[in-house]
Curated annotation (Swiss-Prot):
Disulfide bonds join 30-126, 80-132. This is Interleukin-10. The keyword Coiled coil does not apply. Major immune regulatory cytokine that acts on many cells of the immune system where it has profound anti-inflammatory functions, limiting excessive tissue disruption caused by inflammation. Mechanistically, IL10 binds to its heterotetrameric receptor comprising IL10RA and IL10RB leading to JAK1 and STAT2-mediated phosphorylation of STAT3. In turn, STAT3 translocates to the nucleus where it drives expression of anti-inflammatory mediators. Keywords: Cytokine, Disulfide bond, Glycoprotein, Secreted, Signal. Pfam families: IL10. GO terms for cellular component: extracellular space. It comes from the Eukaryota. It is found in: Secreted. GO terms for molecular function: cytokine activity. Belongs to the IL-10 family. Residues 1-18 form the signal peptide.
C-alpha cells in the first residue's frame, strides 16, 4: 500500500513537471513571436506574390471586399476575433475555390494556405495574440459579399490578400505594443 502511494505521488509530480515544461516551451515560443512575425509576414507576401498578378488580373470589380470597417475591427476590441475569422474564411472558403484555376495556381495557393496555417498555429499557442470569443460584423459582411459575388468573389478575395496581410500586421503590431 505504501509503495502504491509513493508511485501515485511520483506520477503526479512527473505530470506537474511535464506540464510546467510544456508551459515554459509555449512561453518561450511566445517570447520569440514578435521577432519571428516580420519573417512570417514576408513569407506570406512572397507566397502571395506568386499568384497576385493572376488573381488581380481576373478581378474586374472596382470595389474593395476588405474595407476600412474590417481594419477598424482588427484595430479594436474585436481584433482577435476578426483575425481568427478571416484566417478561417481564407483557409476554408476562399483558397479551396482559388485552387481550382489550374495546377500551377493550386500549388502556389496551397503553399500560401500552409503558411497561413502556420501563422494561425503560432498565434493560437500564444494566447495573448488570439484569445477571442466575439463575432465581427465586418467579417460577416466580407463573407456575405464574397458569397454574393460567387466566382468573382474568389478573384476579389485573392486579389486583396495583400491587404489582409497588412491587416494581420496592424493587429499584431497593436498587440505587441500592449
Amino acid at each position: 500500500m505504501h509503495s502504491s502511494a509513493l508511485l501515485c505521488c511520483l506520477v503526479f509530480l512527473a505530470g506537474v513537471a511535464a506540464s510546467r515544461d510544456a508551459s515554459t516551451l509555449s512561453d518561450s515560443s511566445c517570447i520569440h513571436l514578435p521577432t519571428s512575425l516580420p519573417h512570417m509576414l514576408r513569407e506570406l507576401r512572397a507566397a502571395f506574390g506568386k499568384v497576385k498578378t493572376f488573381f488581380q488580373m481576373k478581378d474586374q470589380l472596382h470595389s474593395l471586399l476588405l474595407t476600412q470597417s474590417l481594419l477598424d475591427d482588427f484595430k479594436g476590441y474585436l481584433g482577435c476575433q476578426a483575425l481568427s475569422e478571416m484566417i478561417q474564411f481564407y483557409l476554408e472558403e476562399v483558397m479551396p475555390q482559388a485552387e481550382n484555376h489550374g495546377p500551377d495556381i493550386k500549388e502556389h495557393v496551397n503553399s500560401l494556405g500552409e503558411k497561413l496555417k502556420t501563422l494561425r498555429l503560432r498565434l493560437r499557442r500564444c494566447h495573448r495574440f488570439l484569445p477571442c470569443e466575439n463575432k465581427s460584423k465586418a467579417v460577416e459582411k466580407v463573407k456575405r459579399v464574397f458569397s454574393e459575388l460567387q466566382e468573382r468573389g474568389v478573384y476579389k478575395a485573392m486579389s486583396e490578400f495583400d491587404i489582409f496581410i497588412n491587416y494581420i500586421e496592424t493587429y499584431m503590431t497593436t498587440k505587441m505594443q500592449k
